Amino acid sequence: MASGPHSTATAAAAASSAAPSAGGSSSGTTTTTTTTTGGILIGDRLYSEVSLTIDHSLIPEERLSPTPSMQDGLDLPSETDLRILGCELIQAAGILLRLPQVAMATGQVLFHRFFYSKSFVKHSFEIVAMACINLASKIEEAPRRIRDVINVFHHLRQLRGKRTPSPLILDQNYINTKNQVIKAERRVLKELGFCVHVKHPHKIIVMYLQVLECERNQTLVQTAWNYMNDSLRTNVFVRFQPETIACACIYLAARALQIPLPTRPHWFLLFGTTEEEIQEICIETLRLYTRKKPNYELLEKEVEKRKVALQEAKLKAKGLNPDGTPALSTLGGFSPASKPSSPREVKAEEKSPISINVKTVKKEPEDRQQASKSPYNGVRKDSKRSRNSRSASRSRSRTRSRSRSHTPRRHYNNRRSRSGTYSSRSRSRSRSHSESPRRHHNHGSPHLKAKHTRDDLKSSNRHGHKRKKSRSRSQSKSRDHSDAAKKHRHERGHHRDRRERSRSFERSHKSKHHGGSRSGHGRHRR
């Protein structure tokens, strides 16, 4: 009894018609019949006879396209070239191994069947070809050793590369190849369900020619055999029945040799074959002679490219990089990798506008406290503008005062100016905001301007350093404003400077008698 998925068993009753019987099914099931007379007992049932068939070993139409190789990204012309090249290797190796033609044909049919279940991208066609011819030699009762098969394929590889033939060294590479062939043979058996029987049309061709009374024409017989051997490179042996293939080979040979055959009715109708099937087989066979010879190197590169692409797709599906490292997810979560738009380095020479804004924000509460003491809103706006340029004016006034003063008491004056002028400036401005109302300037009074100049000359001898700092402050204030408001603010600064100088003169005169109180007050205000 058969144990393959493509085998069926049929049983017939031997004696009485009352015995139950069942016909064989096409799905590989075994039918049983019990009889009262003698027969074959299988298990607990008695059978009259058991027949094994493989009528359903053909590939269905839905499996012909797309093939597993096409699903892995290999195009149909490349797959067809690989099938042709694999069958040519099996045929050439069978000749060198002195195998019968039936064994070589069996190996090629097994090769086609296997690659309709597996992909050329995932399995090396050369290793599978070795396994198929080794398995076919055992099936056709002409076994060959694996070492001979490997040596023959090594010799064919050297001839294909136009290299000097050299024997294969028995090293680790040879051992690995031998193990791969053994594993591939086991894989072929598993994929085919151990149903490796192949019905060849060789004998069928001779039988049909005898019916047609053409068996004595050796040229016709040999030509039909040649067409059949060439059709082994195509997929017709896994699509059509061997009887149909035999009729197609006879049809091609008779047309090539211009031998007439019966047409009323057509001779192939006698053997249960249609004209459409014969024409399709003839087209597939004749197409071989119009194709270019397959390029082994280009096919290997194409398969290797698809193999790398398939491996990268698998790693990407697992979330890994091509080198095997885990890929960082950019869809969600925290990523330690910096964004390409974020600045990596901040130059120290460039001044960031954010830092300037932060500095002004920090100084803003002090300005608000000083401006809150004034009952007028207009003074507050001017004080804000003057505070923004105060830091720059301080640095400029210090450098200018150091360069202009040549007295031996320069360091003492600088210290006094740092401690005293800050406190005096803050007190004078706060008092001016709180005590004096907002005054309108008289632009047409030359007597006041002359009086101001005389007071400046008198106070310059006593407080030269303070006058220099006040002038630097007025200059820094005037530089920050536009040209339209420069004249107006300069005149307002004269009145304010006059009041500040008078009060600072009084405080400095008192500080001669009370020096410690002024410095302490300056530290407190700072």
Swiss-Prot record:
One of its GO terms (cellular component) is nucleus. Signal peptide: none annotated. Residues 382-418, 438-452, 460-476, 486-498, 509-526 have a biased composition (Basic residues). (Microbial infection) Interacts with human herpes virus 1 (HHV-1) transcriptional regulator ICP22. It comes from Homo sapiens. Contains a RS region (arginine-serine dipeptide repeat) within the C-terminal domain which is the hallmark of the SR family of splicing factors. This region probably plays a role in protein-protein interactions. Widely expressed. Overexpression in primary tumors of head and neck squamous cell carcinomas (HNSCC). The modification Phosphoserine is found at residues 335, 338, 352, 355, 374, 445. CCNL1 is amplified in several HNSCC. May play a critical role in the formation of loco-regional metastases and an unfavorable clinical outcome of HNSCC. Residues 88-190 are annotated as: Cyclin-like 1. Pfam families: Cyclin_C (PF02984), Cyclin_N (PF00134). This is Cyclin-L1. The keyword Repeat applies.
